[in-house]
Amino acid sequence: MNYITKLCISLYCISIVSAQVSGIVVDAYSEQPIEGVNIISEDAGTSTDADGVFQLDVNERSILQFSHIGYHTINLTAINEMVVKLEEKVIDTEGIIVHAGLAEETLQRIASSVTVFTKRDIKENGSEHFQFLTDYIPNLNWAGGTSRPRYFQIRGVGERSHYFGEGPPNFSVAFVMDDIDLSGLGMAGIMHDIKQVEIFKGPQSSVYGPNAMAGLITLWSATPQDSFESNLTATYGSDNHYRLGLVGNAKIIRGLSIRVSGLKNYSDGFRENISKNTTNSNKRDELLLRTKLKYQPNEKLVLVGTAMIANLDNGYDAWAPDNNQDFKTYSNQQGQDSQKSTAFSLRANLGLSERMDLTSITSYSETDLVHSYDGDWADDTYWYNNHNFDPEVEGWSYEFFDSNEKNRSSLTQELRASIGSFIIGGYYKHLKEQDNASGYLFSGLVTEGKGIYDFNVLAGYAQYAYHFSSVLRLIGNFRYETNKIIYTGTYLGYDAALPPVKFDLEHGMLGFKGAFQYQDDNFTSYYLSFAQGYKSGGVNQQPFLAEKNRPFRPEYIQNVEMGFKKMMDNYSDRLTVFIGNRRNQQVSVSSQQVLGDPNSFYYFTSNTGSGQLGGLEWDHDHVITSNIRLTASLGYLDTKVEEFSYQMDSTTIGIGGNKAAAMAPKLTGSFGFDWRDESGLFARTDLTYKDNYYFSDSHNQISNSYFLINLSFGKTIDAATITFWARNIFDKRYAIRGFYFGLIPPDYPDELWLSYGDPRQIGLTFDYKL
């Protein structure tokens, strides 16, 4: 065989062994070409061009690996003219399970406007309390007037206070922690060992009843695991702030695990009291203890029990008669805003078959609340030096002190059966609240008051999901509930006992929701829903009120939502547009109780109002690179309380409404930038915005809009993390509550009085995980 023949045979063999393989890589769903796909074999590599095309010199029997950020990596055998389809990976939010509904669903598939904070989000935001998450939630606000947020507004609907005489403990926004209803008790929202926070916007009454007419806030603490775990966190910061937390998790026996956590938190409260020469009159002194047990003897039965003690021994000294922005106060009587809650819950899930499950949820809580304050906000020295008010000349000292002590106990039991796409259940609740108040009550008519509310709630509900096809389904649920309320009140005037009040009422309420959901692909969904929520009626406590004005009826809200959700490997978008209509709105009015008696006008709650609301909510999460993540949220809200009239005195008709709802900023938003690298270094900055809003429905005073900027950076070294953080780094002054009334003697002109949110605070946190 000559040389030429041998060379030709050799080249032919080489061409077989090392042939040029070509092909195109496209998106499996859209079939659009993908640029920049990495293609590697054992000894060669390339990437696709702008048209998704590639060429590679490999044997046709070689194994090629195709990888691209945002897509699943696959291995294929090389052939010529390949057509490779890559499937997108869903961003982590697809894996987020929302627990608060009647059935657990992924965040992408749930047909509601929901903001979710995972354990990672909570840690990155440095949130020690739910208070610090509120600025990142579109269309959520909270009213100051307490040491920690208790009263929330979602889409402009929600209470601003619950002083003695303001009615029963009915709330428009539910606050639930580990299946324990703490509505109106949001001070207990400490973020220690919390794994997830879920905020539902819009009526959720068909799931949670009358306390969820405007929305629902749920906090879930970490569940015990079989593995050993131990965590330590310690913080020191300005305002004499320190925080120490511990977590321990262990397996006791097979199927039984325990998790124990505890936290001590303290700060002085950012106030300098001139009268008492102290800096801790507004202190936050908080303790949280929690124990959780998980028992799973087999694959069918799971029991999770939670026991919790929250003891918040906080002071309250947040107002000043000179409205200064230096956080100086002059009160000579110590205020208190404390909450001690002892609670437990037990959730049992039993799987009877692949399609049938039974769930039982039991909870009990008992809470002691004290809210007291110096009613005139100053001492005699201040009033004399600044306003020439001399007690010896006037014959009386300008001193007022109000105190309200509450004890609330609540027992709930829920039973639920899930049969395929059908869910049916029942709910029982017994709540008892006792109030003891002293001070200038009911415009000075009462000096001491005692009230007892006794609630019995019974409800039944059902939900069904019908699948028209693999991509289109209809979800419908309803809840019918009866409330029986008994109120007993006794009162003392300045020189005699006043007429006692005893009244009971019962009413039924219906909530429902229907939603169409279209799943465009594995990553994109749309929904359209219509829902009705409700808030229970109640009994007015005013001792001289006519019997016909004693009760007030339930309030209803009807809501239409359209939503869009897209969740990919490197970004997620959730957009909701909504409109709502409030019916039988509960408002505070006054009426002449005895004809011809000009002194018989008393304020009470009545169903005389209506209102509208509309807007949008947007949440965005974008992983730019493996090191950089951007987050953003936006809320737009347009509200209106329709005009209504009420009797102010014997000759004057007052006009209310015809303006936006109180505590309802038109715009809320946030933007976050997070960076971290492989060495353990990290940094994060957040900007939040809140538009101006009316402080109250009873006057036209408004807040100022404001931006806040927070910053943190640090380093992780093995199991330890050190974080330096700063909140409100530009020391912005922003009001969280405003009252409009006459305070300054001798003429007592009406003025706007403001209480401010936290100033700048800096600190250092050390976390260690075993």
What positions do the PLM features span?
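N-terminal periplasmic accessory domains that precede
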Residues: 81-85, 133, 151-153, 196-199, ...
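Structural signature of Gram-negative outer-membrane beta-barrels, strongest in the C-terminal barrel
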Residues: 294-299, 308, 417-419, 427-429, ...
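Gram-negative outer-membrane beta-barrel transporters
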Residues: 467-470, 474, 483, 579-581, ...
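Short, acidic, small-residue-rich periplasmic hinge/interaction motif at the N-terminus
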Residues: 26, 67-71, 79-123
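C-terminal beta-signal and adjacent terminal beta-strands/loops
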Residues: 534, 581-583, 689-694, 715-770
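Short acidic/polar hinge/loop motifs at secondary-structure boundaries
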Residues: 164-203
